[in-house]
Amino acid sequence: MALSRSTSTLSLTSFFLLLTLLSTSTLVISQPALNSAEQESVYQILESINSAIPWRSLYPDDLCISAPHGVVCDYFSENTTATIGTPHVTEMSFGYVSDYSPNPPCTPKSTINPLLFSSFPQLRKLLFYKCFTETTVTFPDFSTLRSSLEELVFIGNPSLVGSLRGNISNLTALKRLILTGNNVSGEIPDGLGDLVNLEQLSLSRNNFHGEVTLSLEKLKKLKILDLSQNGFEGSAPEPLGSLQQLLKLDLSFNNFSGKIPENLKGLKKLEFLDLSYNGFAQCGVPLFLAEMPSLREVYLSGNLLGGQIPEIWDNLGGILGIGLSEVGLVGNIPSSMGMFLRNLSYLGLDNNKLEGMVPEEFGALESVNELNLENNNLSGRVPFSAKFVSKVGGKLKLEGNPELCADEGLRSAKVSGSLGQLKLCNKPVIPHFVLLSSGSSVLHDSYMLIFVGFLFLLS
């Protein structure tokens, strides 16, 4: 009886297993294959990226079922009643990033044929990471890309040249345009301002130049704007203050000039602001920073702003990093910086004309990992404990302040940093006694005159 029950259970299990296999097999067989035009275009792109790999023999079947990592498909139904749609390539990522993203590897001779991308009507993402490093490749004309594209990414391609050409405004679905560390040049086309779905525009580390005349008013969804390390010039774009969703603004290492736009105070969600190393001048540290409570990092170094450090820190307790190096600051460091900036990790005030003492409150900045006060006119005793100095180590930079001093106990502690370059505070003065001797003729004569005068008074 037990044997019969066991046999019955085994038969039932086998039946369901067979049914599952048949269902899966039927599903696979019933799925439509990727069309030949897209399949062939993928092969050709892979071969242009790395011709040493036999892509066709490694992946001879439907690329929507078996494809290299980085090639992704999705199924699209032409009507709501269809259970299985038509497959299309939706993502292509090239260039090995890591073991977690083993995209098809590129070679120094990788190239690209932009005409091939017209074969992909549902392409959403296109990424090239460190692919074009030796062979010169011209940036593809945007007119070859379909309006379905949401992400266009080129990172670390020094041989990628040319400009943003074509009718870029046709990419109406574009959310992220990331061109970082390439050799793309020219000006930003006005058509970028029509990409109303854009959330990230990163053009850093290229050779763009000219004034930024881009109309930003329509980019209501923009969260990241990074134009750093290019050759942009002129005034900073005035409409920046209208980008209400902006979280990061980086214009550093360009040739922008004039005053820092006051309408930046309208960026209530902004967390990262970097305007360092431009030509902004004679406007002081912006007072409107006090009206931007979401700020976590603000870097203004390398601009001749001038003036004193303002008292604006009581509403900015969340700030983690402040860069005010080489901006022409004068006057004292306000103690309010130490009182309110309790979460501060980095503070750069070096290469200015600051004077007075380092505020005692700085000694209580427990989160600081780097503090640079080099090359100012600071004086007096440093307010740091041995524990503080040991924690910050070599990133506590105090050199170039001749009148700054450290206590002997702090100097003798086994801590690193620039304390060893400071003079000792309260160095004891050893009195110099002059003994009366035959060699001290001037002093001897003086005492004799006093003695004679005393006798004269007594008489």
Language-model segments: residues:
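Consensus "Asn ladder" position of solenoid repeat domains
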Residues: C131, N157-P158, N182, L203-N206, ...
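LRR N-terminal entry segment and analogous cap-like coil->beta motifs
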Residues: N79-G162
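Surface-exposed cap/linker segments adjacent to membranes
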Residues: A2-S6, L10-S77, T90-D99, K130, ...
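Membrane-proximal ectodomain caps of single-pass cell-surface receptors
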Residues: L267, E271, F280-C283, L289-E297, ...
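Tandem repeat domain/solenoid detector
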Residues: A173-K175, G181-E199, S204-K223, S228-L247, ...
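Leucine-rich repeat
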Residues: S119-L123, F142-L149, N157, S169-L174, ...
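The feature encodes a structural signal of leucine-rich repeats
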Residues: T111-L115, T136-S143, V161-G166, S185-D190, ...
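Right-handed parallel beta-helix
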Residues: Y129-G186, D190-R205, H209
